[in-house]
Amino acid sequence: MTFDTNDDSIAKNSLAPYNQETEQQQEEGAMKINAGTEDDVQPQEIPSSIPILPLRDVVVFNYMIVPLFVGRERSIQAVESATTHGQHIFLCAQKDSQIENPTEEDLYSVGTVALILRLLKMPDGRLKALVQGISRARCLTIHNEDGYLTATVELLQEPQPTVKPTEQEALLRYAREQCEKILALRGIPTGEIMGVLSNVNEPGRLADLIAANLRLKTEEAQEILQCLEPIDRLHLVITHLTHEAEVATMQVKIQTSAREGMDKAQKDYFLREQLKAIRKELGDAIDADEEIEEVSSALNKAGLPAEVRKEVDKQLRRLSTMHADSAEAGVIRTYLDWIAELPWKKTSKDQLDIHKAKTILNEDHYGLVKIKDRILEYLSVRKLNPKSKGPILCFAGPPGVGKTSLGRSIAKSLGRKFQRISLGGMHDEAEIRGHRRTYIGAMPGRLIQAMKQAGTKNPVILLDEIDKLGNDFRGDPSSALLEALDPEQNHNFSDHYLNVPFDLSKVLFLCTANHLEHIPAALKDRLEIISLPGYTQQEKLAIARKYILPKQLKENGLKENELIISDTCLEKIIREYTREAGLRNMEREIGSLCRKVARKKAEGKKPPFRITTNQIEKFLGIPRFIDDDTEKTLPPGVALGLAWTPAGGEILYIEVSTVKGKGNLLLTGQLGDVMKESAQAALSYARSKASSLNISPDFAKSMDIHIHIPAGATPKDGPSAGVTLTTALISALTGKSVRGDLCMTGEITLRGRVLPVGGIKEKVLAGVARGLGHVIIPTKNTKDLEEIPQELKKKIKIHTVSHIDEVLPLAFSETIPVVTKKKQTKQPTS
């Protein structure tokens, strides 16, 4: 319970453990007087209608003597009325102590009829009443008389215990033992109090006596008051006693632990002093002044800017006035060590030989012409203008295409140090900017740590997985990167730990990302985006032959001539055991093949080992990816679309079925909102062109259309399926079949225009990988064809269209006849 001296009717129990007296006085006097008196008022003397005194945050039990301060006007009137009519008053607790003038709904129905033993008027107008609970009672009706509340009450008689005497005695003893345990844990003498408890042999009275002296919430005390059965009431009290004993035990443990901690600190201090004396006798002691001199010397050699030097001198002066073993001195020494070890002036000399840099890039990576050209352009500019600011390049593409390893090769070609910072899953802004030195264990941010590890002012820092930065209540790391990645600001980058500006303008920042849409707009605006699309099968074959196979042979202890594998076998691995835009799975499969061969060699078989296509399944198991047989002609209502995923392009089957119905459109296959809208647009276009396409004009009312895109467990979205949806829908409505060697992509409008989409290279690669002969793309995507190698263009015929009318003649085996209105005929739908 919590008492507030400003409440109108608040118990100021000098006997309870939470009063204003000292703790020892509270505990020693609590039980002795609260046990009641021998001349308790008998229930028959109590009238049935008596004044009500609402209580805040206190419940009065039978036989308990409690002082109350009464301050509310109508409460004062109720007490004064009670003193003139038999001294009896009905005490009931408020459900909400904040209510100033409680009504019947705000009061508990069960309370205690009490006798006013003494009344004293205070100088401020309040009353101080000493009351004794004499009987539980239930309020039947409440009346408002002359400004105060009166109640018609029913006295509640306590039933006789129904348990065996032995069980009753066991409960009484356990309750007393718990009380004794609590008193002992609090260091309160138990003799007198336990004597009082031992004399109370009625379970109900003992429960009330203990409950009146426990720290109980109003709801908990009211629950005990309303419980009439004495054994049940004692059980409730024992539950609270057990909880109180556990809390007291925990308090003792905490106090003991704190005391031991203080003792240990004192012991450590004396041991340190003794250790100092021993070291001094041995001549090993390092004087604090000598240590400061060493730090100062290191700082002088660091070549600090004037602003940083000013802060460092300030910290050195503070350090010189502190005790060497103080915690603050350790923090300052660590800070000064960080300042001394950072590369304030040291830079590495750039390798400006363009031809040598080109050779290094070509040795480490196959293809990637755009990125290599961009790096060589940067070198050329640096050669002509050494003061030029470095670009901030972001390599965007699917996993496994070499974005991270490319950063290391760029650093090697430039002759610079390389540092990588993984940003995946980072949520705390302090990871970038550091923690302020006021925090225990504070450290600089990851950028400053990378600069220290690099040891030069102009390293290459790769910010890996920049699209996977998070944010929460600890801040937004992407916002903290804005300053570091802005060429106009990063010459004065501020780290919270250093609290002095640090120049990052000489750093070449590189970033990698899988999903550009996940990068915040302000951060993306500072990046020069360079896309890394997936590799073609020919590129993968060349990389496997030139880079991956030699690497795996070396890692598995094989020589180059000990494993002979043909291009056909490598193509089979690429085609049937991996399906990705990058190279990671292909490297794993080739590594698995090399391990199998290494085992044969270790078992005593003599190389060389020649791998044939028939042996691939023996070594690598059943092929994981087997393409469906491409049908020359698809069933009506089916068309092949193209989709882009972070892992590369994919073939997308779109199926449309029509049945008799009422014009409902059903879409299944986990379609996103944009794809659903594309389906609606396709349906609207088909309805608007029904006459010219020889489709029944009332098909939208007489049949239901079901559009399904297989792989239902995979979410799909985007506008690029619009052309395919329209083609499949018209195919289903006309009964015409779409060519099986044709795939398509493009956004559709209500007027039938075909709009450009993204991921053209990856989509064309998917069509080639499936063995399709034709692909339809929007005319405005013609510029993207430059990224597609010539060998791929020879394998697939690329058709560019700007309107759906250009798609239909290419899509159907037979051209759909254009029918004028005069010759319009109805054709049954499939």
From Swiss-Prot:
Protein induction: By heat shock.
Subcellular location: Cytoplasm
This protein's record includes keyword Lipid metabolism: no
UniProt domain Lon N-terminal: residue ranges: 50-245
Record EC number: 3.4.21.53
One cellular-component annotation, GO: cytoplasm
SMART domains: AAA, LON
Swiss-Prot/TrEMBL GO biological process terms: cellular response to heat; protein quality control for misfolded or incompletely synthesized proteins
Domain (Lon proteolytic) ranges: 633-814
GO molecular function: ATP binding; ATP hydrolysis activity; ATP-dependent peptidase activity; sequence-specific DNA binding; serine-type endopeptidase activity
One Pfam family from the record: Lon_lid
Catalytic-site annotation from UniProt: S720, K763
Region feature (Disordered): 1-28
Keywords assigned by UniProt, alphabetized: ATP-binding, Cytoplasm, Hydrolase, Nucleotide-binding, Protease, Serine protease, Stress response
UniProt keyword Nucleotide-binding present: yes
Catalytic activity, reaction form: Hydrolysis of proteins in presence of ATP
Domain of life according to the entry: Bacteria
Residues binding ATP: G397, P398, P399, G400, V401, G402, K403, T404
Enzyme class: hydrolase
PROSITE patterns associated with the record: LON_N (PS51787), LON_PROTEOLYTIC (PS51786), LON_SER (PS01046)
Function text: ATP-dependent serine protease that mediates the selective degradation of mutant and abnormal proteins as well as certain short-lived regulatory proteins. Required for cellular homeostasis and for survival from DNA damage and developmental changes induced by stress. Degrades polypeptides processively to yield small peptide fragments that are 5 to 10 amino acids long. Binds to DNA in a double-stranded, site-specific manner.
Entry's family note: Belongs to the peptidase S16 family.
Subunit structure: Homohexamer. Organized in a ring with a central cavity.
The protein, known as: Lon protease
Organism: Lawsonia intracellularis (strain PHE/MN1-00)
